[in-house]
Amino acid sequence: MPHVDIKCFPRELTDEQKTALAADITEVLIRHLNSKESAVSVALTQVEPDAWQAVWDSEIAPQMAQLIKKPGYSM
């Protein structure tokens, strides 16, 4: 409330980089959604490139109308 689940190809991020990413996303949500810091949760799910089609099929394509930033690619 809000919860953000970032899915991306695998990256070698340090714990410090993950913390910074979460802090930046949290800051944006606080600013734009008037959320409290304690209400925000952020997940980072790394998906192998050969498994991305499943993400597209289950999460991106069916929700295209709800996406506030659409991808510049299709599958």
From Swiss-Prot:
Q: Where in the cell is it found?
A: Cytoplasm
Q: Which InterPro entries match?
A: 4-OT-like_dom (IPR004370), Tautomerase/MIF_sf (IPR014347), Tautomerase_PptA (IPR017284)
Q: Which domain of life is it from?
A: Bacteria
Q: What is its main location?
A: cytoplasm
| Keywords, ordered alphabetically | Cytoplasm, Isomerase
Its top-level enzyme class, in one word, is: isomerase
Q: Which GO terms describe its molecular function?
A: intramolecular oxidoreductase activity, interconverting keto- and enol-groups
Name of the protein: Tautomerase PptA
